[in-house]
Structures are given as structure tokens and as C-alpha cells.
């Protein structure tokens, strides 16, 4: 039985005052979510501050991105995997659709980052997903297969035992639109099936989160699906009550 995992992606939001308020709210109810893994991923500049605000042992810390380079060096503006580890991160989000679309990250870039993260002892949260145009033109499966295959080619299928996958339909991110529970389940089952062709044992163990406008009012239905193992939460993770409610919905499964 896979443990459900809910991670909050704060994106480029927050300051010390708002983070203190948010984390105080999370700490107050962190023990109410049941047997659920919970993490928050603040902006890099606030990682250390957030860690110091979090109640030890209840909520894990993650980065939103990291450098492709495996060692520190002359890479202005970048954050290395070792730096994320040094401030207490366990996870790092890689391949988010915003990184792909806005910053031009390729499948090969993301695959290299996944390898660097794994080699550094971080658990990558690998984001995959299709645009509305790709879905409507029947390319959903080929797009997601290509995204997965790039990483499998780089690290091998066995390494996926240490990877979290987040399916994020690009058309449902920040739009208020959500894939139906059945639509999401169908894609999650497809992802697991693709991995199972190479290693059924690893496929069964891999946590596959759903990311795409998850809210307290739709979390239970999404998380009740057999191949949906939690969520990568954007906007709702900036509200302590909403994020805790989503985590509680995971804990009730």
C-alpha cells in the first residue's frame, strides 16, 4: 500500500511575515492529517527561514527547482542540489510545466536534473503533463511517454523507486479547471502502466501525485482513485486551512 503524499508548491509567493503566519497555521494542525507525507516547497531564498519556522518532524521541506550542474561552481543565480540538502530539503520539484514553458527546459534538461538530485540524495518530484492542445489532438500518451522515457534513459527504471511523479495537466494549472477524477485516474494508470512494462515492482511502489487546481472540495474524490497517491498543490497551499483540509482528505483514504 502506497503512502499518500501531499506537497505544497508556493511558487514565487511569500515574505517572512506571510510565511510565519502560514507555517504557524500548518504547525497547529499538522498532527491532524493522519498517515500522510506532507512537504512544503517555498521560494529558495526562504527555505532556511521556513525550515526554522516548521515544527520538527511533521512537515518536510522541498525546493522548487535546482541547477542541472552536479557540482557547485560559476553558475550565477543557480542553486545546487548540495545547497538544497544543506538547508534541510528532502525533495525538489523538477520539470514543472512553468519551468518547461517559461524557461525552455527540455525533457533532456529535466532528466539530467533528476539524475543530479538522486545522486545528491534528494527525492525528485518529477512533473509530467500535457497541454490542452496536446490532449485534444490525441497526443496525451505520446507526450507523457516522451517525458518519462527521457528520465528512464538517463537514470534507469530501478531508480524510479526513489522518484515521485506528479501528473499535472497543464490546462488545469492555475486556471480553476480540474481534470475529472476519472480523467486523472486514467492518466495515472497509464503512467503506472508504462513503468510496469519495465519493472512491475517499481511501478507499484511509485507515488504518483495529481497536480492541477486541487482544492478542499475536490481532493477526496481525486485521492480516492486507485492510482492517485496525493497531490502537488499550488494556490491552495498558500492558505493553511485549505492545505490542511487537502492533507486531511488524503489521510481519510
Curated annotation (Swiss-Prot):
Keywords: Cytoplasm, Gluconeogenesis, Glycolysis, Isomerase. InterPro entries: Aldolase_TIM (IPR013785), TIM_sf (IPR035990), TrioseP_Isoase_bac/euk (IPR022896), Triosephosphate_isomerase (IPR000652), Triosephosphate_isomerase_AS (IPR020861). It is an enzyme of class 5 (isomerase). Pfam families: TIM. It comes from the Bacteria. Homodimer. This is Triosephosphate isomerase.
